[in-house]
From Swiss-Prot:
Monomer. It catalyses: tRNA(Ile) + L-isoleucine + ATP = L-isoleucyl-tRNA(Ile) + AMP + diphosphate. ATP binds at residue 598. The gene is ileS. Its EC number is 6.1.1.5. One of its GO terms (cellular component) is cytosol. Keywords: Aminoacyl-tRNA synthetase, ATP-binding, Cytoplasm, Ligase, Metal-binding, Nucleotide-binding, Protein biosynthesis, Zinc. IleRS has two distinct active sites: one for aminoacylation and one for editing. The misactivated valine is translocated from the active site to the editing site, which sterically excludes the correctly activated isoleucine. The single editing site contains two valyl binding pockets, one specific for each substrate (Val-AMP or Val-tRNA(Ile)). This is Isoleucine--tRNA ligase. Gene3D superfamilies: 1.10.730.20, HUPs, Ile-tRNA synthetase CP2 domain-like. Its cofactor is Zn(2+).
Length: 916
C-alpha cells in the first residue's frame, strides 16, 4: 500500500503565486460589476456615519508615490470604518483651476492671444477633465474604492456657485476687502501668490551696506553723521522712504577715521568686521535709544527724497545694522510700520517685474538686473560702503520655481485679523494624532498675514465684484447671489462671455452709475479659496455627506494649504472647523532618504509598482511606513515587502488547504470542548484581533504590519501550523483532535482575512472566494471580527509553555549540530527540573508533549543527569527509540509487523484500518 495516499494532504485552488498585476484588474472589474461601493453603503445606511473628506489633488500630471501614499491610507481608513459598520461614503475630488493648467496648454502650443478668454478657459476645462480621467483610472487601479463615477470637481457649476455664495457670506461679514498692499508677486507667473504658494530655495544675492546722510538731525545726532543700512535687495533702494529703528534698542554714533556712522550698539562689532574697520580707530561719540532717533530725517542716497527715521518693533539684532531700509511698496513689515507714519507706498515695477517710468533711470530694467545698476549708482554717490554676495534661503514660486518679490498692487484680501482668534479657538477644539500637527497649524494661523485671494490670471473662479462709473465697489448680497445663480445655471464662463450689465440683477441701479454703466472685476480667486470652499461645495451639498467631516487627511504641506484655507473659510462662515480630526503624512523619499528626481535616477512611480508587482504590494508597503514622517521607497524596500507578502499569502494558502474538508456548520467543535492548545491559539487570535482593531482605530498601520508578521511567524508558522501537520495530515478525517484544530484554523483564516482586507484588498478578496462556507459574497461586505475577552490564565500558562518550547528547540538545534539527530522527529526529549523551575510539575498539565515539541518521544523526569540547563529546565536530546513509522515518520517501539499494516505505528494502524 502507498501510505502517501492515506494522508489528508492540503487541497485548495488558491494559487501559491499571486500574479497580482494580471489578477487585480479582474477582481476590480468584478467589484464594479457587482456595484460593491453601493452595496457597502447600503449595508450600513441606517448606522452612524464616518466622513473622510478628500482633499482634492491637482488635475495635472501623472500620479507620484505621494498620491499613492495618500489615497491608499484614505482607503485603509474608509474600508475599515465600513467593516466596522459605519456608513462611510468616500467622494474623491479634484482641484482644477490655476496656473499649471494654463502653462500646460501653452506648452502644447495653445496660443492664448489668438482666442477669447472664454475659449481659452474652455480648453483649460477640457484639459483638466482629461487629466481627471487618467488619474481616476490610476487611483482605482491602486484598489481605492469610492464614488469615482460621481466625484467632486472644482470647475463644475454647482461647486463654483457654492464657492461664490461662501465668498458672499464672508463679504457680508466685512471679511473681504480691496487694498494696495505688498504681496508675494511672481514675475514669472505675472500674478500675486498666497503664502501657501511659496517655497524656499537657496539664492545668490548681493549684500550691500549703504550710508544715508543726515538731512535734519532734530538736534539729536550730528548733522554730518550717516545711518548705515544693510539689504540683500538693492533694487528696492529706489523705493526707500524710511529707516526703521527699534524704539528700545540702544544706538551709537561711531567715529571711524573722521566718518560718523549710526548703528545699533549690539551690532557695532559685527558691522565693523563686515566693513573692515580697524577696531583701534572706532570711537563711540554719542548714545541714544531708537525712540530718541524717531523723526530724524535722512537723505535718500540718489533721489531728492527724505528718508524718515521711524520706530518699528520688527527690527532685530540678528543681522544687519539695526537700521532697517524701509520700502512700504516691497515689504509687509515695511508696509505695516509705514501705515503708522502715513508713508507713501512706492512700487515702480510692472507685472513682469520690470521697472516702470516711476523707476527713473532704471526704467525698462528687470528688477534683478537693476541690482547692478543701483549698486553702481550708490558707488558713484559714495554711498556704497560694502558690496558682497551671499547665498541664502529665498522665497520662490512653487510652480515656476523662480524667485518672487514683494510688490504693492491693488489686491483683494480675506481678513485674517478679524477671525484669527476664532480660528485659533477652533484649532483648540480639533483633535490631532500628534501634538506637533496642532502646533504647526496653530502657529501658521497665529503668524500669517492677511490672505491675498485675487490672482491676475484667467483660469479660475471670477471674483463676483462690479464697479460703478465713479469707481465704487459693488459687492452686495443681491449681486453676489445673482452671480452664484448664473454660475450654477451656466458655469463661470458666463462672466467672460457677458457684459457687466448682463451679469447684474435685472433693473439694478447704483448712485455711482448715473448712466447705468458698470464694469466687472477681471481678477480670479486664489485656487486655495477654491479647494478651501469644499466643505461648502461638497460636505454641505452632497446628501450622503455632512459638515463637519470626521477627518481631513493630507500631506504635511497642507497645514499651510488646504487645512489652513478650509478652516479659515469655515470659521468665517460657520463658526467652526470643517474637520473634527486632522491627520497628515510625510513625503516619499528614495531608499536613502533623498528627494526623488529624474536626474538622480531614483524615481519610483505607482504605475511601475502596480505593473511589476501589483497594487497589494504598494498597499502593503504603505502599511509598512511610519507615514507621520517622511517615508522611503526603493527597489530593495519593495523586494522586502514582496517577501513579506509571499509569507502572508503562503500562510493563508496553507490554512485554506487544510480546511477544504471542513464545514463549520456541521464539523465545528464547541469552544469548551476544544483541545487546550487550540483554545490557546483561539485566545492568541483574540489578542491579535483586539490589538489590530485598536491599531486601525488609531491609524497605526505600521503596528498592524509588524504584528501580522509576528502572529504569522511566531504563532502560526513556527508553532501551530508546524505542530498541526501531524494532526491535519495524519489523524482520522473526522477525529476530535483534527476537527478541534480545524475549528480554530477556520476562525483564524476568516478573522485574518477580514483584518487584512482594508490593506490587502485584492488578496483578501481572493482568499475569501476560495474559503468554503462563507456567508457574505465579498470580504469587503463582511464585518470586522468582534473584540472578545481573553482567558488570561490560559494565556499565561501557555506563554510559559511556549518559552519552555523555545528552550527545547534550542536543545534540538544543538543536537542537530552535533549530528545526534537529523530531523526533529528523530529525537527523544528528556526534560526535567532545574534549580529555578519545576519543569516536571509544570508539564504534568499538558498532553501530547511529543506532538507539541514535534518529536517522537518525550520523557519528563525530576532530574536529568546528563542534561544541559536552560531557563525552563534541564534538557537532554537522544535519538528516538524504536523504528520510524512509514506513514507519520514518528519513531516507535510498537511498529506493526504483518500484512497491510506492516511498519505502521499503532495510531496509523487505526487510521488505515478504516480506509482499507
Amino acid at each position: 500500500m502507498n501510505y502517501k495516499d492515506t494522508l489528508l494532504m492540503p487541497k485548495t485552488d488558491f494559487p501559491m503565486r499571486g500574479g497580482l498585476p494580471n489578477k487585480e484588474p479582474q477582481i476590480q472589474e468584478m467589484w464594479d460589476n457587482d456595484e460593491q461601493y453601493r452595496k457597502a453603503l447600503e449595508k450600513n445606511k441606517n448606522n452612524p456615519s464616518f466622513i473622510l473628506h478628500d482633499g482634492p489633488p491637482y488635475a495635472n500630471g501623472n500620479l507620484h508615490m505621494g498620491h499613492a501614499l495618500n489615497k491608499i491610507i484614505k482607503d485603509f481608513i474608509v474600508r475599515y470604518k465600513t467593516m466596522q459598520g459605519f456608513y462611510a461614503p468616500y467622494v474623491p475630488g479634484w482641484d482644477t483651476h490655476g496656473l499649471p493648467i494654463e502653462q500646460a496648454l501653452t506648452k502644447k502650443g495653445v496660443d492664448r492671444k489668438k482666442m477669447s478668454v472664454a475659449e481659452f478657459r474652455e480648453k483649460c476645462k477640457e484639459f483638466a477633465l482629461k487629466q481627471i480621467d487618467i488619474q481616476k483610472k490610476d487611483f482605482k487601479r491602486l484598489g481605492v474604492r469610492g464614488d469615482f463615477n460621481n466625484p467632486y470637481i472644482t470647475l463644475t457649476p454647482e461647486y463654483e456657485a457654492a464657492q461664490i455664495r461662501l465668498f458672499g457670506e464672508m463679504a457680508d461679514k466685512g471679511l473681504i476687502y480691496k487694498g494696495k498692499k505688498p504681496v508675494y508677486w511672481s514675475p514669472s507667473s505675472e500674478s500675486s501668490l498666497a503664502e501657501a504658494e511659496i517655497e524656499y530655495h537657496d539664492k545668490r544675492s548681493a549684500s550691500i551696506y549703504v550710508a544715508f546722510d543726515v538731512k535734519d538731525s532734530k538736534g539729536k545726532v550730528d548733522s554730518d553723521a550717516q545711518f548705515i543700512i544693510w539689504t540683500t535687495t538693492p533694487w528696492t533702494i529706489p523705493s526707500n522712504v524710511a529707516i526703521t529703528v527699534h524704539p528700545e534698542l540702544n544706538y551709537g554714533q561711531y567715529n571711524v577715521n573722521g566718518h560718523k556712522y549710526i548703528v545699533a550698539q549690539a551690532l557695532s562689532e559685527a558691522v565693523a568686521e563686515a566693513l573692515g574697520w580697524d577696531k583701534d580707530s572706532i570711537q563711540l561719540e554719542k548714545e541714544f535709544t531708537g525712540k530718541e532717533l524717531e523723526f530724524v530725517e535722512a537723505q535718500h542716497p540718489f533721489l531728492d527724497r527724505v528718508s524718515l527715521v521711524i520706530n518699528g518693533e520688527h527690527v532685530t539684532t540678528d543681522a544687519g545694522t539695526g537700521c532697517v531700509h524701509t520700502a512700504p511698496g516691497h515689504g509687509e513689515d515695511d508696509y505695516i510700520v509705514g501705515q503708522k507714519y502715513d508713508l507713501p507706498v512706492i512700487s515702480p515695477l510692472n507685472d513682469k517685474g520690470v521697472f516702470t517710468e516711476e523707476g527713473g533711470p532704471f526704467e525698462g530694467m528687470f528688477y534683478d538686473k537693476a541690482n547692478k545698476a543701483v549698486t553702481d549708482l550708490l558707488k558713484e554717490k559714495d554711498a556704497l560702503l560694502k558690496l558682497d554676495f551671499i547665498t541664502h534661503s529665498y522665497p520662490h514660486d512653487w510652480r515656476t520655481k523662480k524667485p518672487v518679490i514683494f510688490r504693492a498692487t491693488p489686491q483683494w484680501f480675506a481678513s485674517i485679523n478679524k477671525v484669527r482668534q476664532d480660528i485659533l479657538d477652533a484649532i483648540e477644539d480639533t483633535n490631532f494624532k500628534v501634538d506637533w500637527g496642532k502646533t504647526r497649524i496653530y502657529n501658521m494661523i497665529r503668524d500669517r498675514g492677511e490672505w491675498v485671494i485675487s490672482r491676475q490670471r484667467v483660469w479660475g473662479v471670477p471674483l463676483p465684484v462690479f464697479y460703478a462709473e465713479n469707481g465704487d465697489i459693488i459687492m452686495t448680497k443681491e449681486t453676489v447671489n445673482h452671480v452664484a445663480d448664473l454660475f450654477e445655471k451656466y458655469g463661470s464662463n458666463i462672466w467672460f462671455e457677458k457684459e457687466a450689465k448682463e451679469l447684474l440683477p435685472e433693473g439694478f441701479s447704483h448712485p455711482g452709475s448715473p448712466n447705468g454703466e458698470f464694469t466687472k472685476e477681471t481678477d480670479i480667486m486664489d485656487v486655495w479659496f477654491d479647494s478651501g470652499s469644499s466643505h461648502r461645495g461638497v460636505l454641505e451639498t452632497r446628501p450622503e455627506l455632512s459638515f463637519p467631516a470626521d477627518l481631513y487627511f493630507e500631506g504635511s504641506d497642507q497645514y499651510r494649504g488646504w487645512f489652513n484655507s478650509s478652516i479659515t473659510t469655515a470659521v468665517a462662515t460657520r463658526g467652526q472647523a470643517p474637520y473634527k480630526f486632522l491627520l497628515s503624512h510625510g513625503f516619499v523619499m528614495d531608499g536613502e532618504g533623498k528627494k526623488m528626481s529624474k536626474s538622480l535616477g531614483n524615481v519610483i512611480v505607482p504605475d511601475q509598482v502596480v505593473k511589476q508587482k501589483g497594487a497589494d504590494i504598494a498597499r502593503l508597503w504603505v502599511s509598512s511606513t511610519d507615514y507621520l514622517s517622511d517615508v522611503r521607497i526603493s527597489d530593495e524596500i519593495l523586494k522586502q515587502t514582496s517577501d513579506v507578502y509571499r509569507k502572508i499569502r503562503n500562510t493563508l494558502r496553507f490554512m485554506l488547504g487544510n480546511i477544504n474538508d471542513f464545514n463549520p456548520e456541521t464539523d465545528s467543535i464547541a469552544e469548551t470542548n476544544l483541545l487546550e492548545v487550540d483554545r490557546y491559539l483561539l485566545n492568541r487570535l483574540r489578542e491579535f484581533t483586539a490589538s489590530t482593531i485598536n491599531n486601525y482605530e488609531n491609524f497605526d498601520y505600521l503596528n498592524i504590519y509588524q504584528e501580522v508578521q509576528n502572529f504569522i511567524n511566531v504563532e502560526l508558522s513556527n508553532f501551530y501550523l508546524d505542530y498541526g501537520k501531524d494532526i491535519l495530515y495524519i489523524e482520522k478525517k473526522d477525529s476530535h483532535k483534527r476537527r478541534s484544530m480545524q475549528t480554530v484554523l477556520y476562525q483564524i483564516l476568516i478573522d485574518m482575512t477580514k483584518l487584512l482586507a482594508p490593506i490587502l484588498v485584492h488578496t483578501a478578496e481572493e482568499v475569501w472566494s476560495h474559503t468554503p462556507h462563507v456567508k457574505e459574497e465579498s470580504v469587503h461586505l463582511s464585518d470586522m471580527p468582534k473584540v472578545v475577552d481573553v482567558d488570561e490564565e490560559l494565556l499565561e500558562k501557555w506563554n510559559t509553555f511556549m518559552n519552555l518550547r523555545d528552550d527545547v528547540n534550542r536543545a534540538l538545534e544543538q543536537a542537530r549540530n552535533e549530528k545526534v539527530i537529523g530531523k526533529s522527529l528523530e529525537a527523544k526529549v528528556v526534560i526535567g527540573n532545574n534549580e529555578t523551575f519545576n519543569t516536571a510539575e509544570f508539564l504534568q498539565q499538558f498532553n501530547d508533549l511529543q506532538q507539541l515539541f514535534i518529536v517522537s518521544q518525550v520523557e519528563v523526569k525530576d532530574k536529568v543527569n546528563d542534561g544541559v540547563s536552560y531557563q525552563y529546565g534541564d534538557i537532554h536530546i537522544k535519538h528516538a527509540e524504536g523504528e520510524k513509522c512509514e506513514r507519520c515518520w514518528n519513531y516507535t517501539e510498537e511498529l506493526g509487523s504483518v500484512g497491510e499494516l506492516e511498519h505502521l505505528c499503532p495510531r496509523c494502524q487505526e487510521v488505515v484500518k478504516t480506509l482499507v
